[in-house]
Amino acid sequence: MANLTRRQWLKVGLAVGGMVTFGLSYRDVAKRAIDGLLNGTSGKVTRDRIFGNALIPEAQAQTHWQQNPQQTIAMTQCFGCWTQCGIRARVNADGKVIRIAGNPYHPLSQEHPIDSSVPFSEAMEQLAGESGLDARSTACARGATLLESLYSPLRLLEPMKRVGKRGEGKWQRISFEQLIEEVVEGGDLFGEGHVDGLRAIHAPDTPIDAKHPSFGPKTNQLLVTNTSDEGRDAFLRRFALNSFGSKNFGAHGAYCGLAYRAGSGALMGDLDKNPHVKPDWENVEFALFMGTSPAQSGNPFKRQARQLASARLRENFQYVVVAPALPLSTVLADPRGRWQPVMPGSDSALAMGMIRWIMDNQRYNADYLAIPGVQAMQQAGEQSWTNATHLVIADELPTLAGQHLTLRHLTPDGEETPVVLNTDGELVDASTCRQARLFVTQYVTLADGQRVTVKSGLQRLKEAAEKLSLAQYSEQCGVPEAQIIALAETFTSHGRKAAVISHGGMMAGNGFYNAWSVMMLNALIGNLSLSGGVFVGGGKFNGVSDGPRYNMNSFAGKVKPSGLSIARSKTAYEASEEYRDKIAGGQSPYPAKAPWYPFVAGQLTELLTSALEGYPYPLKAWISNMSNPFYGVPGLRAVAEEKLKDPRRLPLFIAIDAFMNETTALADYIVPDTHNFESWGFTAPWGGVASKATTARWPVVAPATHRTADGQPVSMEAFCIAVAKRLHLPGFGDRAITDPQGNTFPLNRAEDFYLRVAANIAFMGKTPVALANQEDISLTGVSRILPAIQHTLKADEVGRVAFIYSRGGRFAPEDSGYTEQRLGNAWKKPLQIWNADVAAHRHAITGERFSGCPVWYPARLSDGRAIDDQFPIGQWPLKLISFKSNTMSSSTAVIPRLHHVKPANLVALNPQDGERYGLQHGDRVRIITPGGQVVAQISLLNGVMPGVIAIEHGYGHREMGATQHSLDGVPMPYDPQIRAGINLNDLGFADPTRTITNTWLDWVSGAAVRQGLPAKIERI
């Protein structure tokens, strides 16, 4: 028993005295209170009579930083969500992670990060005492609790093979070597008949179908999917695309934010990388958030939350959040910001209404929009330009419709240079003109004698906005006409110190054009790369390139995938054999059997469902690395799960994962993967950081997964290396990597790859990073991996790579993101008021030409039918939306503490709807959609627009430990709490207009639809 002081006796007396007043029925409570004071609340004596069992501090900082010699503070990467912040992990002498906080060197964890040149101990001192009040570097709820998943009993640590039928949840242990043998060589693996292994599938010289050579080689019958780039994407792509050579690779973007990214890419003129912008938080005067809610969601999540909080302190800052449900970004008591409700999937009606008012009232930046080229931009002292004045062929003519008029069209020997109408009314080369006319409609005679109508890009946008009146736009989006005008007027009243940003709220049945129209508002005021406007990120130190120390991109025998992706990405339907065969047979080529996506890539939403239907060809194997479409894609479970359980449709399924997610549970083989704190990797901010930055992840503790025969931890990398070496694929093995001098180096272990990437990062630019000193190496725990660094790298690389890991990455000075009045990286391409690449194509189902500029389309199905026509509002009066949780993410369900904070997700309805359906706050209801039904507890909140059900995302798992499996006949650990709540994606549905069955997708980009699902509700 701990010794009692007089003060403690007084506390006991006060506690007992207070409880006596509650009567004898509370004697047990009183007893527990006394026991807690005497012996600790757990019944065990606490380590300290004052601090209880609190962690021993990592250091004392009274005069200078004196770190606890029993702890190291490792700077690494978080993976609690897709922001992937830099964090610091406290690791004790036993090699156990005991606490997580933020990395003060990292721009995603510190609003104004500490410069990397500051020694580690000095940086830590700045976080302590009074200075720590201003410079505290923290982690969010997900990051702070991520260590619990590292030690979760739900982790998968050894290779497993299914027994019984696919999806039954019965497994057996196998060695890593047996797993490699079976998946490579194939055979009668499950007593269900022969299964081709990866050796048989890897046939780069054999066509899938000799009658359809455009499909490409049999190698394409391997699908590889990755959750996304959590730091190791480059390694997996090296294996799948450039070593094995498959065309079919996918990531989760199609069910995360593809509609927004593609719409943004259309404006930015880059539909390959789909770049996007973020606001200059320190100088913006008016911010409009449409489809994103900083502090509630968005990326970077934590950084934007801090920046919004700081911006609120400025007198000249205002903001509006446009969303169907009130987010944490704004509160009713905040005079700086307000919430504007909007109907789900109607953002472009609001945006186009604003654009119409801006056009009608000439509130656009005319001088900026009149700049027709780079030379004129430089002469005007601008930082960006648009193609608003470039002339577009408006007539529906083969190969010409929607294309920009060029000098080649006017004269046979002319160049492919856009043409504008200058201020004197003359047709001139856009690159030599200083100012061009904004609004043009006139006839032009082409070199071949054709007389065509041409219009300027801005004229086309104006006409698109004029398709509806403000009253009609108001009716479509549910925002009063006066509010549309007020938003447009306010947005254009701050010069260029206004900004619009968006993200996942665009994932609707018209998401691509929603996103493009929203982001177009930035172009109309000319705010790109300017103080108070928006900017593209500062970029990253790309060590996976052919860098200063190693060629990490090029290697002998590197394969360029060929043929057709099953998702039909970046391929025009009109170039397909299906189209040509229909034309040859005298048929109308439209509709195709399924949508094609001529200018957008990344449709994991199409890859699996198309393969299971054998269109355009079947798959033979799937390797999934942590991907989980069966949890993340609305309606996919109902559409595809039973089909995937049939091995005849997809004979071999290998999942690489640290946990049994909803998709991994359907696999034939499971390769256990290392945890975030056990693995290597490199990531970079998605946006919102003006300076260049790259995060370094490294094994701060020893991996817990089983070992291979040669001592490697089993992981994604170990699997790829073993398969590649067994098949003698290029890019792996003893002589896989070269340096600029032609020397060769091995790729036999994960660190062979990542440490050489780190060396490239360390030496990039005019000056390499500094050498790490011994104190930094020791205090940050880099000493644990120093032997691997010394063994793998050249002597002059060791100290600089150690420096990279001691800082958790490489970060350019914060002020490097601001140069000559420009914020962030320069954007050299013209903003696309009219995108001719989009306008060049037709929709493969309806045959209609895609609009080359933003325009209002209602949410629609694949055949062009409006969703409300297929599912009438009279029968389906409500619309479902999902919103990001600020505590739980889809991958953190295995963390118990997050469930303790919030056991189930919020499912919210407006009180007006509650009254309409006879519901009280807390009632249990049945939510029904065309795809299914779930039971939930409803909350009645004024912060939800009438007609909307808002569902918090991240809950309602069926796997991730929610269901018990068996291993060698022994029940595996599980936690039924993980099943709590509901998942909106279980309510998604199949598009009834499609021939090749799939879920409801955005008709342009193929992005999953999770905003605006038709629904109804019943009280239970």
Swiss-Prot record:
- Source superkingdom: Bacteria
Signal peptide location: 1-33
Q: What happens when the gene is disrupted?
A: Mutants are defective in tetrathionate respiration.
Which Pfam families does UniProt cross-reference here?
A: Molybdop_Fe4S4, Molybdopterin, Molydop_binding
Q: What is its EC number?
A: 1.8.-.-
Record's GO cellular component terms: periplasmic space; plasma membrane
Localization, per the record, is: Periplasm; Cell inner membrane
Q: What UniProt keywords are attached to this protein's entry?
A: 4Fe-4S, Cell inner membrane, Cell membrane, Iron, Iron-sulfur, Membrane, Metal-binding, Molybdenum, Oxidoreductase, Periplasm, Signal
Give the GO molecular function terms: 4 iron, 4 sulfur cluster binding; metal ion binding; molybdopterin cofactor binding; oxidoreductase activity
How this chain assembles, per its entry, is: Probably composed of three subunits: TtrA, TtrB and TtrC.
Report the protein name in the record: Tetrathionate reductase subunit A
Q: Which organism is it from?
A: Salmonella typhimurium (strain LT2 / SGSC1412 / ATCC 700720)
**Which gene name belongs to this protein?**
ttrA
